[in-house]
């Protein structure tokens, strides 16, 4: 199993929800009003007057076989407009209760 955390500009919300539904991913946790900035490019997303954009973040735990489909979809979303911002991070899930 893998944990995938997706951090994205809130403008991508409908695309992320659609992807989760289309890939049959039912379980996830969502954080709203996530602040931050990219490591190499893009503007800060801080929800302030100076930097008004804001992010969301979702984490889901999935079988290994679906990881590449998720990452490919994230890459396609990012390629549509790389200035809006979306990133995905994958971790091994060794145990769960």
Predicted regions and their residues:
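Positively charged, small/polar-rich N-terminal and surface patches that mediate targeting and assembly
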Residues: 1-97
């Amino acid at each position: 199993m893998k944990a995938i955390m997706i951090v994205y500009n809130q403008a991508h919300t409908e695309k992320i929800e659609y992807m989760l539904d289309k890939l049959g991913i039912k379980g996830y946790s969502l954080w709203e009003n996530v602040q931050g900035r990219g490591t190499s490019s893009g503007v800060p997303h801080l929800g302030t007057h100076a930097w008004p954009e804001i992010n969301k973040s979702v984490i889901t735990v999935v079988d290994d076989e679906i990881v590449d489909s998720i990452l490919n979809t994230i890459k396609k979303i990012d390629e549509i407009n790389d200035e809006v911002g979306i990133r995905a991070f994958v971790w091994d899930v060794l145990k769960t209760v």
